Amino acid sequence: DSGPTFVVNNDRLGGVDWVFNGWGDHTAFDWSRDANIASEILRMTGAERRPSPLVNEGGGIAVNGKGDVLLTETVQLDPGRNPTASKTSVEQEIHHQLGTERAVWFERGLWRDYQNHGTRGHVDIVAAFVPDGSVLLHRQFDTSHPDSKLWQNQCRALEEAGFKVRALPAPRIARDNIDWVDYSYVNHYVGNGFVLLPAFRDRTDEHALEILKDLYPDRHVTNLDARVLFAMGGGIHCITQQQPLVV
């Protein structure tokens, strides 16, 4: 989340250095040193630094490389992050930095993400673009879970933007020893030749694995127990950043 968002322009590697302020200062931990991680990574990689005045995190955006970006109102418009921002000003800065042209907004993210250690609605646990041009969308089928109410509006927003939506079911595990969980297979990492998918020791793990294998036939898809990461408010995609290979 605190790392740079890598971009490529005319075969030159760059990285957007967003302002990081601890997810709108929504954490009990000291994040002051985390705020310097992006610039340090860019120095180490030799990528061109593109500073941005926008408070944003890696998990707060999802892009398809074709001009589209997914955003969440409770993240980019969070008073603790960007108190004077509007959708228009956010989109202008996002498009300027990433080269995107169109934004699709969700009202909010998953319920647990608003509790302790949460990000207040990161989109990378809700939706992800896949190679065939469709969007994987987290779907909670347990109607007692608060996240079950999100599907209709999020699906409508994507379909109105012209996207085919693929449901990626939530694990059947709905609660841990604290409260409702935000376990999500959407929060996966795509690397060169592989896809790393979260697992939760749930019978839905294998079903999700097969869905991702069908979508990434040219990559080895494997899964890894991610319950500890999710317990602390993160996930596999949350703790990684995609750096494109530029030679």
Where are these regions (language model features)?
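The feature marks the mature, well-folded catalytic cores of soluble enzymes
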Residues: 1-247
